[in-house]
Structures are given as structure tokens and as C-alpha cells.
Amino acid sequence: MLKKTLAVIAGTLLTCGSFAAEVTLRDDHPTEYTVVEGDTLWGIAKRFLNDPWLWPEIWQANSQIANPHLIYPGDQLSLVYIDGQPRLVKGQRPGVVKLSPKVRDISDRQAVTAIPLAELEPFLEQARVISPADAKSRPYVVSVEDHQLYGHGDRVVYVRGLNARAGEEFDLARATYVYRELPKRMPWNKGPARVVAEPWDSSGALTFGKLWTQLTDWRSEKSEHILGHEVVWVGRGRVIAAGDPAQVLMQHGGEEVKAGDLVLPPERAPYDSSYSPHEPESVPDNMRVLAVSDGIFRSGPLMVVALSRGARDGVANGQVFSIFAPERQIRDTVKHPEGDIRTAFTPSKAKVTLPEEYLGHVMVFRTFEKVSYGLIMDGIRPVEINSVLRPPRST
């Protein structure tokens, strides 16, 4: 999950104009390639293309076979030219393309996915982002059997606000962090530690500590608009007695359930992994890196980041973006050293704005309404919170 490194960054949604890029092959591209276990579409695309997100432009699916867009270990891919344009096809050698029906038994094989999904299981099966309305109204665990603070399999937990019948199943999840939306122009000047988000307290209690936090947030121009609340799955239970509180028998779980955990409907729809790397039609305005996983304030290749835009904004699985460090202002100490009385009353004259700096590429692999998760695919520098997303560009 996105741990203590979660930070919140901001924006409002506008879209920039659509863009397109020309397909260029790598100088060292092969003419044939046999897919092996562990391959990803991104990795295969990088063997042939300078820009892997242009995979849809080169992939030539055979419409005469079932699931023509899927690739399996053992498939032979060949580079051919159709109307003078490079295309990648299955089972063909360079030359004239001949499409013909072909039946194969693929029931025991897994199709190649865009990214290594097995390594992202916690983000696919355990984490989710719920809306502020859901966060306020969700039923919650008030106590665990035998007055214990924690409970796990074969224990009964007591849930308030659960309108359900005996036999219904629910997921139990733990509140982690809040994703907030902030102004475009960051009001802080004390480094990333100043913008780290606080853990989400799902109790709803108003304490002096919370009042102080709200006051300091207001003074820092922090917007109160919440993009979503992240929760982490801790178990599944079945209602054995309705009421308030209802009794829920824990059936299985990853962690012990405790008072304060939320009760959510199970996610029934299976994760759709049939997407491929592609460039977005546009980039939502001020789309930023909200948080990074397993790091303090920065992240590198094959690490997960949370992004400040989601399905509502047109973000979809497989979209690839470039990540840039945002513009920043520094003092021109060459022309205006510290203590220069010429800028005592006009300090802005001593400032110079450094341009955005390219950091790497990120591919979206899971979307929620206003937030999405992405995997950093490559980079030349660590990605930090508050980094801004742009259309994908060649490295």
C-alpha cells in the first residue's frame, strides 16, 4: 500500500489538446522474437520501438483467431511491413502477410500482460480508494468478540450501521490515508516533508489536534477538497445476526480486524488485465504524483505511485505519461548574493525560475473515480511527490 510516504498534491481538471507521435523502430530491433514466460507487453514493445507506448500503432492483430489481441508465451512475433508501415504479427516471417485461421489450445496458459501484475497484487486485490461520501457513511467495527481489540478467522466482530441480512458477505478494510487536492502553486518552501499527508482517522471525532491541523492547513492554503480515502483489505466476513450492532463471523483475512475498521461490499468484478501500453488522448490539467510506495519522498523504476486524477478525468489503464519535476524558483546568488540591498524590498527580482526536468515514464494500471495507481516504467532520476505528468516523450 501507499505507506507513510503518501502526500497530497493538487489541481483542477482541464484537458490539453490531443497529440500523436510517429512510430520509430530501434536501431537494434529484431525481425523476429519468441515470447517467453515473464515477458510483458512493455518489455516486448521496448525491443522493437523507441517509444513503447506506441505499441497499438505497430501491433497487427489477426481478426480470424479468438482473442486476437492476446499474446502468449511461445508465440513467435515477426516484424513485417504493410503499406510501407512496420507491423508486428504473430506467426509470420518477414515478407507478404497471409492471415489464416489457426486453432491452438491455450487454456493452460496465461496471456502476456502490459506490466508484471503478479508483483502488484497488493495494489490490485487489497487496496482501493473510496469516495468521501462512502468514507463518512460506511458501517464500522465497534468491538471484537470477548471484548478483544483484535480479531481474525473464526472470530465474531460487532458492526454498527450495517443494514444486511444473515448470510451476506462483506469485506473489512482499514483506513490508511486521505488524498487531497491542493492549489497548483505550492505554498510551501520547506521541502517535501512539509506536504506529507496525515493518516486518515476514520473515527470522525473532532479533537483539539484536528482543529489545530485544520487551522495550519488553512494558513498554508491547503484545499479541503478530498479526492478519495485509501483503505486496505484486512479480511472478509459473513453476517450471522442482523441488528445494530450486527454480528459478523470472520472467515478469512490477511490481518487481524480491530475496532474502527470499515465494512465494505466485496469487489466482485475481476481485474481486467487486457489493456496495452498506449498514449492518452490528452493529459488532465495539473495531474501530479500524490504519493510513492516503499520510500520516503521519492520512487524509482518498478515502484508504485498514486496519481491525482482518475476515471472521471479520462485516465485509463495502460495510459503512459512522462513525469517531470515541477518548475522551481531559486535565488540568483551570482547577480544578487544574500544581503544584496538592491533586492531588500523587491526580492522577486533576485529570483529565477528553473524549467521542468524530465524524470521518467509511468503507466497507469488501476483507476478509481478521482485517483489512480501507476507503475514507474523507467527513469533517469528518482520521482518525487508533487512531480507533474505530461504527454509521453522520447528519452
Give residue spans per PLM region.
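Short, linear, compositionally biased motifs with a strong N-terminal bias
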Residues: G11-T12
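N-terminal signal peptide c-region/cleavage motif recognized by signal peptidases
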Residues: T15-S18
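Surface-exposed, polar/charged interaction patches used for macromolecular assembly or partner binding
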Residues: L2-L6, A20-T395
